[in-house]
């Protein structure tokens, strides 16, 4: 029996030791975990660690976030030509029938925000159930059958259940304004991925607008604007930071008890 226990203990220690020893053949890129992608609006989307992140609250965005840095397209090599003395420059020439709509990486376009959504929902429920049951006293030979001279064989039951419930929800959102964004990618079908942000510094904090999505060049108007309703997979965020925003969020204890419930 002792030999068996010693053998099991030795096997366990050997397995733990082999688990702690890293394989020298592993490459560094195989050991390092992949970085998380950056969301188009919210910023870093790391996995939550549980109640700690819930109590900590939502992380505030910052101005100058690298995920929202402007795109700088690569410079095109200059075309060196012999000086002819003419004021005409081929590099800066534009076709008479060509438009100036954004079509390339780094081009800018103004988005006209015109969001207006309304939602209403109501539901009513009513349930009722009623049961009645009775039996007359039993008679034998014309006489009422009794037990002990006091109780007869009769009963009467009645049951009435009712349930009534109703609920209603109303929500409306409206957002108007404008924000200028830039093209960060040109898809193979010609559609453009856009992204941009605008920060406004106020007395007690900052307000910001962030927008991202996919647009068609054909939907861009002649004045280089496009309606927000023409954006596919639109992500629009309008919020703020600072004291005014902090006062609108529940405190530490309120978040704690909400999690507990």
Swiss-Prot record:
<dbReference type="GO" id="GO:0009279">
    <property type="term" value="C:cell outer membrane"/>
</dbReference>
<keyword id="KW-0975">Bacterial flagellum</keyword>
<comment type="subunit">
    <text>The basal body constitutes a major portion of the flagellar organelle and consists of four rings (L,P,S, and M) mounted on a central rod.</text>
</comment>
<dbReference type="InterPro" id="IPR000527">
    <property type="entry name" value="Flag_Lring"/>
</dbReference>
<feature type="signal peptide">
    <location>
        <begin position="1"/>
        <end position="15"/>
    </location>
</feature>
<keyword id="KW-0472">Membrane</keyword>
<dbReference type="Pfam" id="PF02107">
    <property type="entry name" value="FlgH"/>
</dbReference>
<comment type="similarity">
    <text>Belongs to the FlgH family.</text>
</comment>
<keyword id="KW-0998">Cell outer membrane</keyword>
<dbReference type="GO" id="GO:0071973">
    <property type="term" value="P:bacterial-type flagellum-dependent cell motility"/>
</dbReference>
<keyword id="KW-0449">Lipoprotein</keyword>
<keyword id="KW-0732">Signal</keyword>
<feature type="lipid moiety-binding region" description="S-diacylglycerol cysteine">
    <location>
        <position position="16"/>
    </location>
</feature>
<keyword id="KW-0564">Palmitate</keyword>
<dbReference type="GO" id="GO:0003774">
    <property type="term" value="F:cytoskeletal motor activity"/>
</dbReference>
<feature type="lipid moiety-binding region" description="N-palmitoyl cysteine">
    <location>
        <position position="16"/>
    </location>
</feature>
<feature type="region of interest" description="Disordered">
    <location>
        <begin position="121"/>
        <end position="140"/>
    </location>
</feature>
<dbReference type="GO" id="GO:0009427">
    <property type="term" value="C:bacterial-type flagellum basal body, distal rod, L ring"/>
</dbReference>
<feature type="compositionally biased region" description="Basic and acidic residues">
    <location>
        <begin position="121"/>
        <end position="133"/>
    </location>
</feature>
<protein>
    <recommendedName>
        <fullName>Flagellar L-ring protein</fullName>
    </recommendedName>
</protein>
<comment type="function">
    <text>Assembles around the rod to form the L-ring and probably protects the motor/basal body from shearing forces during rotation.</text>
</comment>
């Amino acid at each position: 029996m002792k030999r068996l226990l010693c053998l099991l203990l030795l096997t366990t220690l050997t397995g733990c030791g082999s688990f702690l020893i890293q394989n020298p053949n592993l490459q560094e890129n195989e050991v390092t975990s992949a970085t998380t992608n950056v969301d188009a609006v919210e910023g870093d989307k790391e996995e939550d660690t549980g109640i700690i992140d819930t109590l900590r609250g939502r992380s505030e965005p910052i101005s100058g976030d690298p995920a929202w840095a402007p795109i700088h397209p690569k410079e095109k090599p200059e075309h060196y030509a012999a000086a002819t003395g003419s004021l005409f420059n081929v590099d800066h020439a534009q076709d008479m029938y060509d438009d100036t709509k954004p079509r390339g990486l780094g081009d800018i376009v103004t988005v006209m925000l015109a969001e207006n959504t309304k939602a209403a929902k109501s539901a009513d429920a009513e349930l009722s159930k009623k049961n009645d049951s009775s039996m007359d006293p039993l008679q034998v030979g014309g006489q009422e059958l009794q037990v002990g001279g006091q109780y007869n064989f009769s009963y009467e039951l009645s049951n009435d259940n009712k349930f009534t419930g109703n609920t209603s929800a109303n929500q409306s959102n409206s957002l108007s304004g404008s924000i200028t964004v830039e093209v960060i990618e040109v898809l193979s079908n010609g559609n453009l991925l856009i992204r941009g942000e605008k920060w406004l510094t106020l007395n007690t904090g900052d307000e910001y607008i962030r927008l991202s999505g996919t647009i068609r060049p054909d939907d861009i108007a002649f004045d280089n604007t496009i309606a927000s309703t023409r954006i596919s997979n639109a992500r629009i965020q309008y919020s703020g930071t600072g004291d005014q925003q902090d006062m609108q969020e529940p405190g530490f204890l309120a978040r704690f008890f909400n999690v507990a419930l």
